[in-house]
Amino acid sequence: MMIEILIAVGILGGLGLIFGLVLAAASKVFYVETDPRLEQLNECLPGANCGGCGYAGCGGYAEAVLNGEAPIGKCASGGNECAQAMAAIMGVKAEAVTRKVALVRCSGEKRYDKSGNLVAGAKVKAEYEGFKDCTAASKIGGNGPLSCKFGCLGFGTCVKACKYDAISIVHGVAKVNEDRCVGCMACAAVCPRHLIVPVEPERNVVIACASLAKGAVTTRGCTTGCIGCGLCKKICPNGAITVEQNLARIDYSKCDNCGLCATVCPKHLIKNSKVETLGEPVIHSMNNPDAKV
């Protein structure tokens, strides 16, 4: 009995040794040498895999940089420090990366009176009862549940896309927390209304609206939308504001952040501070700001 056990153990041990030798030989024969710079590039990146660079993850971007398929400086989360470190590894010079944050171009926060009637913000033409997703909602009834076809739908698709908890839904409109935002713009990629754009944090004056409708149409759909009146353009001392397609626009190469435009805007959609500090993300229903969905 003991001899049989020893024989079995010996056979198994021999097979293990043979297989080990075969695997060791195979690893030598089929070994593919990797560039040590790839690991170094990966170490420079934050590892968030946010996709803001256009690649599936940090590893994909690092490999693309190594192969010369992607420029250095596309990692918004890593910022300038990351870009300079990657440039040093690749032996090239990288331009300074300017930090940017996301801006949601909508001022249609819905305000209600004690009776539940809408008194300010984007008007709701129908209550949406479907899947809580902005893309899905935007396809209902032509332009979604809002009267304004340019406004934020407020179902939090951008909130779900953000890996940094930098976006909240406040009174039916997405708001960005500048302190948490890294500028990866993953939120912009999923917004069906294309409302989210990158801006420099130092820019204290922004136009929080994206409506291209004529003034009368905008007013029917939202009490706080841009009507293209041009008052902001007239008061700007630097000629930094133009009105194109019924929407005021700021040329930041001319803007000195004086804020005069905000003082004359009849709709109060020109903000002196483009990003608000918010609490925990809360998604409200379209018609009732107190009801979470």
Task: Set out the residue ranges of the language-model regions.
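Cys/His-clustered metal-coordination modules, chiefly Zn-binding fingers
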Residues: 213-214, 240-247
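Ferredoxin-type iron-sulfur electron-transfer modules and their immediate structural context
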Residues: 3-229, 233-235, 264, 268-271, ...
